[in-house]
C-alpha cells in the first residue's frame, strides 16, 4: 500500500506548479488553503507543502500559508523550502508542520542537519534528495553540488535518517512518468528507507506502478491539477489491500 501525498507548491502565497524546477514555467492553481481543504475532503491524510519563495531566497517565506493549512485542516503536513537555520526549522514546527524536509542544508552544513536529526528525531526530519544527472541539487534546484546521490544517501542513512524525499529533477512537472529505476535501486540498497518518490507522475497508473515495485510513498501535484489522477481509484486500491492483508493475517493455517 503506497502512501499518497498531494503537493502544494507556494509562490507569493499562491498554489503553483513548475516544470523541472524552472520558475519561468510557473502555472497558478489557486489558494493553498482551498486546495488543502479539497485534498482533505477527498480523503487525503498527508500533504507536502513547498515554499518555493523560501527555496529561492534561502529562508522560509510562506509561513502564514503553512499555518493556515495546519490550523484549518487535520492533514499531516510535511514542509520544505528555505529551511536553512535553526530558527527556520523551529518556525516551521511552530506553524504546525509535523515533518520538515531538509535537503540543501545537508550539503552545505552537514553538522547542522545531523543536529536536527538528533534533536527532533528521524520521524520528523525528511532528507531531501533532489537529483540531476546523478548529483544532488540545492537551493531550489538552482545549483548542482558535486555530491553523488549514492554517497549522499549512504552518509545520512548510516546516520539514522529514515525518511527520504527523492526528486528526479528532469522528470518533475513533465507528466512523463517517474524515475522507476532510480527509486527501485534506492529501495534495493536501503530496504528500511521510507522513500517518498517525487517527480514525473502523470497518471493513476504511474502511482499504481510505483506501488507494485514496493515504493512506500509518492508525492504528486501537477498530474492532479491537470485532471490526470483518479484519487478515488487510488484510495479504493489501498483500502482493498488493507482488507486483503487483514484477511490474510486472520487466516488460520
Residues covered by each model-derived region:
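Structural preference for beta-strand elements that scaffold enzyme active sites
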Residues: 3-7, 46, 74-78, 98-101, ...
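Conserved anion-binding
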Residues: 12-13, 17-23, 98-172
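Active-site-adjacent beta->alpha loops and helix N-cap segments on the catalytic face
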Residues: 4, 54-70, 84-90, 104-126, ...
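Short catalytic helix/loop segments, enriched in acidic residues and glycine
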Residues: 22-40
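Non-catalytic positions within long, well-ordered alpha-helices that form the structural scaffold/packing
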Residues: 40-43, 93-94, 157, 211
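C-terminal helical cap(s) of enzyme catalytic domains, especially alpha/beta-barrels
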Residues: 112-120, 211-212, 217-220, 224-242, ...
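Active-site-adjacent loop and "lid" segments of alpha/beta metabolic enzymes
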Residues: 19, 133-145, 174-177, 185, ...
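Catalytic cores of alpha/beta
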Residues: 73, 77-99, 181-217
Amino acid at each position: 500500500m503506497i502512501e499518497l501525498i498531494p503537493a502544494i507548491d507556494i509562490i507569493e502565497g499562491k498554489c503553483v506548479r513548475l516544470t523541472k524546477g524552472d520558475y519561468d514555467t510557473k502555472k497558478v492553481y489557486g489558494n493553498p488553503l482551498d486546495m488543502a481543504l479539497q485534498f482533505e475532503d477527498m480523503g487525503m491524510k498527508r500533504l507536502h507543502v513547498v515554499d518555493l519563495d523560501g527555496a529561492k531566497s534561502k529562508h522560509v517565506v510562506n509561513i502564514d500559508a503553512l499555518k493556515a493549512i495546519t490550523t484549518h485542516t487535520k492533514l499531516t503536513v510535511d514542509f520544505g523550502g528555505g529551511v536553512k537555520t535553526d530558527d527556520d526549522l523551529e518556525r516551521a514546527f511552530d506553524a504546525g508542520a509535523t515533518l520538515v524536509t531538509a535537503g540543501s542544508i545537508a550539503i552545505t552544513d552537514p553538522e547542522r542537519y545531523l543536529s536536527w536529526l538528533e534533536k527532533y528525531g528521524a520521524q520528523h526530519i525528511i532528507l531531501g534528495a533532489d537529483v540531476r544527472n546523478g548529483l544532488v541539487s540545492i537551493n531550489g534546484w538552482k545549483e548542482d553540488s558535486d555530491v553523488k546521490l549514492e554517497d549522499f544517501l549512504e552518509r545520512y542513512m548510516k546516520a539514522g535518517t529514515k525518511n527520504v524525499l527523492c526528486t528526479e529533477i528532469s522528470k518533475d512537472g513533465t507528466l512523463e512518468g517517474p524515475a522507476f529505476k532510480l527509486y527501485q535501486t534506492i529501495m534495493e540498497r536501503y530496504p528500511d528507507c521510507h522513500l517518498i518518490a517525487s517527480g514525473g507522475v502523470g497518471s493513476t497508473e504511474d502511482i499504481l506502478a510505483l506501488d507494485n515495485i514496493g515504493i512506500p510513498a509518492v508525492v504528486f501535484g501537477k498530474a492532479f491539477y491537470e485532471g490526470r489522477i483518479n484519487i478515488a481509484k487510488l484510495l479504493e486500491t489501498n483500502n482493498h489491500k488493507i482488507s486483503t492483508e487483514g484477511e490474510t493475517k486472520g487466516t488460520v493455517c
